[in-house]
Amino acid sequence: MEMKKRLTLELRNKKPGEVKELVLDNCRSDDGKIVGLSSDFENLEFLSMINVNLLSISNLPKLNKLRKLELSDNRISGGLEVLAERTPNLTHLNLSGNKIKDINTLEPLKKLPNLHSLDLFNCEVTMLINYRESVFTLLPQLTYLDGFDADEQEAPDSDPEADGDGLEDEYENGEGEEEEDDDEEDDLDEEVIDEEDDEDDDLEGEEEEDGVDDEEEDEEEDGEDEEDDEADDDLPRGEKRKRNLEDEGEEDPEDEEDDEDD
């Protein structure tokens, strides 16, 4: 697919100014030059043109916000001064698999003060003696060359600055704080529920104790009644009858007869 058609397809009815990332890998460029890309892509931060048969980047438009440029597996041999003029805020540049042969070709990159990472894998320049030392000396602003720093420490898999993860991290941290607040509220709710459950348990325990006390009192009263009945059973028949009448508020007929005799 031609680069111009691919560019139209990638836009997907968006305006160029709305695009922040653009991938044009493996399409065909006309005469080895960039086609269709303009300064209307004013908010573009990431541009990838891998294996598009580029010979020159002279047609690269002014892209002030561009931070990461992927140009690997092309046939670029020079003309890098265009980058300093049109992509002044570039932080990552990948020129792997191009025709870069000597250190002097990289000299224009000195004018990119924010250049943080440079990749030159499979370029002839990497075969030069003291290649790494020479590049770090020429470009002191570099942190990583071909994925490693000057002390041979490997670069992290992703760089928050280049990938635009800084804002995402802040957003995630904000969400994390909200989640922590939610967790604290949940914990407080659980504590309140536990306290209410404990109060309910205490009330139930008190009610059970009251029930036990009432049962014991009833049993004691029943026991007293039974003792009274047993005592009554032990009385002689006449006295028992008399006692029952007294309890009922009546007089014994025999007593009445005695009164009459008197």
Swiss-Prot record:
UniProt short sequence motif Nuclear localization signal, positions renumbered to this chain: 240-243
GO CC terms of this entry: collagen-containing extracellular matrix; nucleus; protein-containing complex
Gene Ontology molecular function: histone binding; protein-containing complex binding
Alphabetical GO biological process terms: regulation of apoptotic process
Localization of this protein: Nucleus
Record-linked SUPFAM superfamilies: L domain-like
Boundaries of every LRRCT domain copy: 123-161
Compositionally biased spans, kind Acidic residues: 150-233, 247-262
Alphabetized UniProt keyword annotations: Chaperone, Leucine-rich repeat, Nucleus, Repeat
Entry comment on modification after translation: Directly cleaved by caspase-3/CASP3.
Residue stretches of each LRR repeat: 16-40, 43-64, 65-87, 89-110
Region described as Disordered: spans on this chain: 150-262
The protein's assembly and partners: Interacts with histones H3 and H4. Interacts with KLF5; this interaction induces promoter region-specific histone incorporation and inhibition of histone acetylation by ANP32B.
Family, per entry: Belongs to the ANP32 family.
Domain notes: Histone binding is mediated by the concave surface of the LRR region.
Function: Multifunctional protein that is involved in the regulation of many processes including cell proliferation, apoptosis, cell cycle progression or transcription. Regulates the proliferation of neuronal stem cells, differentiation of leukemic cells and progression from G1 to S phase of the cell cycle. As negative regulator of caspase-3-dependent apoptosis, may act as an antagonist of ANP32A in regulating tissue homeostasis. Exhibits histone chaperone properties, able to recruit histones to certain promoters, thus regulating the transcription of specific genes.
Identification of the protein by name: Acidic leucine-rich nuclear phosphoprotein 32 family member B
